[in-house]
Amino acid sequence: MGGRYCEDCAYQVINEKNHYIKGIGNKQSNKIIVFPHLGFSDKTIINSEAFKQISELYDTLFDRNILDDYYITCFVKCPISIKHPIDVMTKARCYNYLREEITNNKYNILILLGNACSLINVRPHSTNNVYRNCTGHYVFVNYSPFVIRYDLLKDSYISKFTSIFKAIAYNNLKEFIIKDL
């Protein structure tokens, strides 16, 4: 499955050998989107409902495939089940993979979706801010993943992501308050 970090992980046993979730998209991009995890029935990012919705929005805004401009990955590298919560050791193992993906991509923009920020231990003050880490990289945080209560909050999701994608595309972060992490 995943390799050296997955040894003795409960999710490796649950998911057998063939369900390791790999990132997709442009590995040379300096922009990364991190989903917290996929549901147990999702085997790949591209088939997940959350990816389909964010991809459709991006295509509508820019008439481009999001995979041409972004690298997209998950924090937890196995599809997870509600019956088996993510424990501290699982977070630590998966964080090692994410750290390698982020380091190898030399990102400048990182968009954390859902609870990915808490899994990575980023503690933002507000989702209306953009955070700059100590190396000058920008981190966008969105507590509202597309997969939860999307039907009730669709307009606010679309508005939030439209402003994020446009700010990044046009290199204009003026509408966001930039704070240091």
Where are these regions (language model features)?
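A polyanion-binding, active-site-adjacent surface
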Residues: 1-181
